[in-house]
């Protein structure tokens, strides 16, 4: 069991790294950023339409904050990556995590909105549970985007200045 878990962890980390590099190196610049701009436009439009939605007053600010961070991180990585590919690749995994958390936040806010509208037809508490789960995610998990933002903005120097010999000297 331990060997299998250790192997799965290696595959998981490698796969995430590859997906992150693909996001930053291929999808971000694809068609001059049109792919990401399309998603950003959808989220921005939803936020603008629901900024004063009473049912979302507790949660929409969390989405707004993480979405702002994602936009800022995207601009940072795009500008750095154009001049130095390593600068774009260095924070790729953190960027992928931030993108995932913000995307999930967007979906949770939409679920909460729908659930609030269906509360009167909820004898088993399904929609109440959706609201509670989504609110938990937005309050307790989504704030991780703040730490990810700090890591992304620190650039790739922590990676690029670390020499291969350092690994060997650590175990001597």
Residue ranges and their predicted role:
Residues 1-25, 93-106:
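Conserved phosphate/anionic-ligand binding catalytic regions in large, soluble enzymes, centered on
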Residues 5, 9-19, 30-34, 38-43, ...:
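Structured mid-domain segments that build the active-site/substrate or prosthetic-cofactor binding neighborhood
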Residues 27-31, 42-172:
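C-terminal amphipathic alpha-helical interaction region
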